């Protein structure tokens, strides 16, 4: 379904007039299957968030292609309504002048639905993410971090996408809230039969929600492994990264 084909990305290194470039992603190839949760695990600076931006078409690769059902995600029509994203910084993800209802409805503006249909959908989505209907007219400054992220998840789900990219989506939340959001994501995945790309540095969270893990290091894939076979990882780096979770 979502296929990354020999993708690379560089950024300019040094001053304005420097011609030197830094390799951030190098020859990345993998697939996220329909209905699965694929974890992309790596330390800060490994390039995993850059990869996330390529998956949703925010940035373009220097070479290679990101395909969704065989079509390039650089074409907005390919990803519109079919690929959504939830990012780490939930506070800047929603326009502070929007009510919760306006924020959730933002991706639906092109769908020619009636006001009644849209309002009914907002109520349904709020219920699914564990927020009361009364939150429709609230603004984000009135909500807790966990509540704002639930609104972001409701917005991402609103178009009933086939795939959601979750880039450190729980890392800014209190530990007590993280598990609640993970359980919510699991439930929504079943309801809508979606795929997730779960980008994180949190090994335990990834092991809880993912079907497969892709270990990322220095802009390259170190190893891909099924979660039930984590003990069988071959890479020395992968074993080191998983030490907090598994005794080898």
In which residue ranges do the predicted regions lie?
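The feature captures the beta-strand-to-loop junction immediately N-terminal to the Walker
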Residues: 41-43
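Conserved ABC ATPase signature
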Residues: 139-143, 147
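Conserved ABC ATPase "signature" region
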Residues: 116-134, 243
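C-terminal boundary and immediately downstream tail of ABC-type ATPase nucleotide-binding domains
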Residues: 129, 216-218, 224, 228-248
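Helix-to-loop junction immediately C-terminal to a conserved catalytic motif
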Residues: 56
């Amino acid at each position: 379904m979502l296929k990354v084909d020999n993708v690379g990305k560089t950024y300019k290194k040094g001053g304005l007039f420097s011609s030197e470039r830094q390799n951030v992603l190098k020859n990345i190839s993998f697939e996220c299957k329909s209905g699965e949760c694929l974890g992309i695990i790596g330390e800060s600076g490994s390039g995993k968030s850059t990869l996330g931006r390529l998956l949703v078409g925010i940035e373009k690769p220097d070479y290679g292609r990101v395909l969704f059902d065989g079509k390039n995600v650089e074409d907005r029509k390919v990803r519109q309504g079919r690929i959504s994203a939830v990012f780490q910084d939930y506070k800047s993800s929603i326009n502070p002048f929007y009510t919760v209802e306006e924020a959730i409805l933002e991706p639906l503006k092109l769908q020619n639905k009636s006001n009644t249909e849209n309002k009914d959908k907002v109520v349904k989505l709020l219920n699914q993410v564990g927020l009361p209907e009364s939150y429709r007219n609230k603004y984000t400054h009135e909500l807790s971090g966990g509540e704002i992220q639930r609104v972001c998840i409701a917005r991402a789900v609103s178009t009933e996408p086939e795939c959601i990219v979750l880039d450190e989506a729980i890392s800014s939340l209190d530990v007590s809230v993280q598990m609640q959001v993970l359980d919510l994501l699991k439930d929504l995945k079943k309801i809508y039969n979606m795929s997730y790309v779960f980008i994180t540095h949190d090994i335990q969270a990834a092991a809880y929600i993912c079907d497969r893990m892709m270990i990322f290091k220095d802009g390259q894939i170190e190893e891909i492994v099924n979660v039930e076979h984590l003990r069988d990882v071959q890479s020395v780096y992968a074993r080191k990264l998983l030490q907090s979770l598994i005794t080898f």
